[in-house]
């Protein structure tokens, strides 16, 4: 009896080995709910004009020239502002509720590094304040009159106008109001 059990077990092992093993009786693995062949396939090219939304204009874009032109403040990429444009900018900062302040710099009107070489540290961020901030000012012409006084007192200085938000305690806008004639 033991020999017949042994031969039946040996026969079962031999049959299982020849017919693909134990996996012959198992269910096929799960491959997903739908066949991939039923979905449409689109092929994308690696052409730059298909990626850029402005098409052929990509090649005509230029950056700020690094030689001979210094970047000072907001709007420094524009030509010098006229008196009417300055009035409009000052009116904008007054409409926002910001306090106008006038500053000037005689030597280095742009950000530079001199005293320290660590990243993020730059000299030239702080200019000399012209008088006090103009608290309560509501007339942009009054701000431009102060700019004219600063020009007369320091004709070789760069002069900028700052809009300061006293609620958030931050400087919100800063732009050059006057550059000397021989400036770079």
From Swiss-Prot:
GO terms for molecular function: ribulose-bisphosphate carboxylase activity. The lineage of its organism: Eukaryota, Viridiplantae, Streptophyta, Embryophyta, Tracheophyta. Its main location: plastid. This is Ribulose bisphosphate carboxylase small subunit, chloroplastic 2. The keyword Nucleotide-binding does not apply. GO terms for cellular component: chloroplast. CDD domains: RuBisCO_small. InterPro entries: RuBisCO_ssu, RuBisCO_ssu_dom, RuBisCO_ssu_N, RuBisCO_ssu_sf. One of its GO terms (biological process) is reductive pentose-phosphate cycle. The basic functional RuBisCO is composed of a large chain homodimer in a 'head-to-tail' conformation. In form I RuBisCO this homodimer is arranged in a barrel-like tetramer with the small subunits forming a tetrameric 'cap' on each end of the 'barrel'. The gene is RBCS2.
